[in-house]
């Protein structure tokens, strides 16, 4: 019995010497496939917001996500991801506070899709997946958005094509009987490299198929003053530690139908990087009037102009921090949005495995 008690601390000591892996946790499957991978990430955020017409506020927030990747065959795989505040379009955060923990109940499905690669140079995604569409910023799609439907990418050397059928609503009665709402996306991308210079350009369109009152929850009816079909133009230039990119969008709305962002990044060294963004988003320029755009600017997310400055710091391979400052104002004073003279400071600590 005494011998057994001696073995216990020895075993625990040996376990303590084993360093955790800084990558997905993998369980090998049949036929040499890496059948199951576990992955996840966590963010701690502090932000402070002030403005000309609001009181100054501060809040601490968090986001947690974990997922599973599974390969059934060489051509078929699947992925599921779960997260905080799953009722939102994006992987948003929940605010600290133990007196009201109801936001803990909103932990659920974030992404769930199957991927097929059995066709040459082609990847097909079926289900709830990230946007398969070139965009260099979060103006059109937030980076962690999940679109539901079928998307595909075909790539052959310098040219690629992105296509998709995205379901917004099905069998929803908004006063006209049960209707569906969807969009179809199509984009061509050209990529080239000259020595250490990499360049990519894209042109595409999102065709919204919905009645005037469909998808009313996002105020996305297709009246003349609202966003219907949207043309997209993108350019991305990378040269060593420097990157310059721009996104430009225009919709069929009769007014306030242009959105663009230009941003530059510079990687100072392995640990430090800086970014600068110029934002201009008119009220009816984006699909569904901006229902899937970024949500970090204070106030409304459309009918805004402003800037974003960011400092990135790499602490370890899977641990980093960033400091962000947003400053925005209304574009069209006749449209009721709450962006007047607002600023937001964010500090993020991000960890993943």
Regions found by a protein language model. Give the residues of each.
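Beta-barrel outer-membrane channel/assembly domains of diderm bacteria
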Residues: 2-124, 150-163, 191-195, 227-240, ...
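Active-site/binding-pocket entry motifs
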Residues: 44-46, 132, 282-283
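Short Gly/Pro-enriched turn/cap motifs at secondary-structure boundaries
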Residues: 57, 102-104, 141-142, 224-225, ...
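Short, solvent-exposed loop/turn segments at secondary-structure junctions
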Residues: 88-91, 133-135, 285
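Solvent-exposed loop segments that connect transmembrane elements
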Residues: 92-102, 175-179, 213-223, 286-300, ...
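Signature for the C-terminal beta-barrel architecture of outer-membrane proteins
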Residues: 118-124, 132-274, 278, 329-331, ...
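Residues on the solvent-exposed faces and adjacent turns
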Residues: 128
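C-terminal hydrophobic structural anchor segments
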Residues: 271-329
